[in-house]
């Protein structure tokens, strides 16, 4: 399920000044350096191999330089590739540093599993954040035997995701499997009640 958000513009806008590529690069580097110093990691957009590598690299780096010290993982994602997401998830769970997760705007699909996988008691959501859980989707081509194999694998992936959410949220496996049958949307309050997050974050 894709949601398109409208971009609102002021009626009168001052013309944008030309960007200096070097200034843009240096500005990005300075922001990045500051966030690393503050042990902040961001997922902004789809979960794929590129974002998975960037996030995993940062988690492992922060663990290496100061093991056991808190990391804050900010999430605004529609979800994406399950295997890429599980690399992040497993890394979060294996390092000694507690990982606090924060839903900034939307944590959908694989993003919701990452959100729920934060350290218990340290999972947060912004006041207008939204969470969506559902079963995995995909498509394929091939022989009937190939399609049967894919269907079996999809079912295994669905059950794995449901079990992770059940364990992280304190829900039964059966309830999560039932909720997976459709796009299941939750606002901030509902996501706390479901157990995906622990607290509403009203001030940074």
Residue ranges and their predicted role:
Residues 1-204:
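Terminal-region recognition feature
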